[in-house]
Curated annotation (Swiss-Prot):
It comes from Dictyoglomus thermophilum (strain ATCC 35947 / DSM 3960 / H-6-12). It is found in: Cytoplasm. This is Phosphoglycerate kinase. PROSITE patterns: PGLYCERATE_KINASE. The gene is pgk. GO terms for molecular function: ADP binding; ATP binding; phosphoglycerate kinase activity.
Length: 396
């Protein structure tokens, strides 16, 4: 990795130093209880590394999308869970900046950990307000960005603060960038990209950037119908972006010219209305009627995609194959996840968001090489964009 990480620092550069670590503790909480602590667990290696070297660790994160101070979005449950995982107390402060916070930090001993309050309680955070960033920077000697999930945002705690104190990457950030970077720069082949989700427009940047890198695309999810309609198929009442039909044609022609395989579904699970108990049928994509709605890929498509997946050596997957939140429409996503898990010879990378949620629901996390902690950030990384939260860190 071209950016400095905490591993590039000498132990004496950390001992006794105040280190402000941007983590991504944006975890789901129901009635004060964290329902999935994966993001907290992912940050542990960096936090432990700093504790072991005698740093004073000051953690900063957002939670949800608060409008000003909101009691239900305070970080107390997060501090409690982190304390259990670390086996040591984590003091949660009631603010992010100001005298009280500065006083608490001045009383910290080597190896202590504090968690600042939800940084998005301040609108200055998302505005990347320089004065606010300066106040945050004043709390510490060194900045560590370990929040890949927000690295595509230029906010005060993800980018602004590194204008005032030296910034380096944490271990999770390093892992995310190295694994995805290697897949893009020197992949084992065949290299395929599986794309799903509702909209082509969300994935255009990824398709264009990967077109020169991959051997093939497998297209599922709602976006398949925009491509099918562009080819002249009847798609019924399925989700279609009519203003993207020309673009869809252009993408398919680009793939053809470059000799990149562009596989569209052969069949789909079809309903007349989207609801949990809707009667389903399987139809080939050329047999749709005017009132049909496609909600998942069908068995022929699953088999076709499975064959490609088992041959691949590098797989990037972003977006579910159907409306997986409804169990009856989740089979395609499940079978694709199982096929990737079955391929023991491939590097498999999942770009956060819905696909990651689906894999967790199926309990297959440990069968994938890497499940990104960032949905939007991994998409922008795959689009070839430089992420603001990485750009500001020191070069090696």
């Amino acid at each position: 990795m071209a950016k400095k990480t905490i591993l590039d620092l000498q132990d004496e550069e950390l001992k006794g130093k105040r280190v402000l670590v941007r983590v991504d503790f944006n975890v789901p909480i129901k009635n004060g209880v964290i329902t999935d602590d994966r993001r907290i667990r992912e940050a542990l290696p960096t936090i432990k590394y700093l504790i072991d070297r005698g740093a004073k660790v000051i953690l900063v994160s957002h939670l949800g999308r608060p409008k000003g101070f909101q009691d239900d979005l305070r970080l107390d449950p997060v501090a409690k869970r982190l304390s259990e995982l670390l086996g040591k107390p984590v003091k949660k402060l009631n603010d992010c900046i100001g005298e009280e916070v500065e006083k608490e930090i001045s009383n910290m001993k080597e190896g202590d950990v504090v968690l600042l309050e939800n940084i998005r309680f301040y609108k200055e955070e998302e505005a990347n307000d320089p004065e606010f960033a300066k106040k945050l920077a004043k709390l510490a000697d060194l900045y560590v960005n370990d929040a890949f999930g927000t690295a595509h945002r230029a906010h005060a705690s993800t980018a602004g603060v590194a204008q005032y104190i030296p910034g380096v990457a944490g271990l999770l950030m390093k892992k995310e960038i190295e694994i995805m970077g290697k897949a893009l720069e020197s992949p084992e082949r065949p290299f395929i990209c599986i794309l799903g989700g509702a909209k082509v427009s969300d994935k255009i940047g990824v398709i264009k950037n990967l077109m020169t890198k991959v051997d093939g695309f497998l297209i599922g999810g709602g976006m398949m119908f925009t491509f099918l309609k562009a080819l002249g198929y009847e798609t019924g009442k399925s989700i279609v972006e009519d203003d993207k039909l020309e673009l869809a044609k252009e993408i398919m022609n680009m793939a053809k010219e470059r000799g990149v395989e562009f596989l569209l579904p052969k069949d789909a699970v079809v309903v007349k209305e989207i609801k949990e108990d809707a009667p389903t049928s399987i139809k080939d994509v050329d047999k749709f009627e005017k009132d049909d709605i496609g909600v998942d890929i069908g068995p022929k498509t699953i088999e076709l995609f499975r064959e490609e997946i088992l041959k691949a050596r590098t797989i990037i997957w972003n977006g579910p194959m159907g409306i997986f939140e409804i169990p009856a429409f989740a089979n395609g996503t499940r079978r694709i996840a199982e096929a990737i898990a079955e391929n023991k010879n491939c590097i498999s990378i999942v770009g956060g968001g819905d696909s990651a949620a689906a894999i967790q629901m199926l309990g297959l996390e440990d069968k994938f090489t890497h499940i990104s902690t960032g949905g939007g950030a991994s998409l922008e990384f795959l689009e070839g964009k430089e992420l603001p939260g990485v750009a500001v860190l020191q070069d090696k």
